Amino acid sequence: GIRATPHLMFKVNTNCMGCHLKKDLNKGHAVRTGAPETCAACHTPEHKKMLSDWRKQVGNEVKGAQELELEAQEALEQAIQKGFDSNTIAEAREMIAAGQKFLEIVRIGNGVHNKKYAITILDEAFINFEDTIDLLNDGG
């Protein structure tokens, strides 16, 4: 399973408003967002790039998981066409669905809010998709 991994800011008792200081508009609504300047204000000038680094890293991991998800789905389609037994097909579908749930958590939750935890969750998605491919490549 996935171990609880509190965000780094949790340890210093910082809530959303500690980082989301920049006033902005989103779909006509006033919102507060995180900004590189906010990171640098509390830390160092080098921390200005932290948010973009986190976004890039999480984005790359999500992209990788999505690509593996497609491979798992393609393997499932091929297994169905080859006439694999219904138990194997059902198991593969369950593993793909589990992987999709983990992937969706990070997509919806915006992984930069807790990068370490997001990567841990995405690891579970990767495992489910890889296990599906292995199951179907082994012939069930």
Language-model-detected regions and their locations in the chain:
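Amphipathic, non-membrane alpha-helical rod segments
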Residues: K82-A125, F129
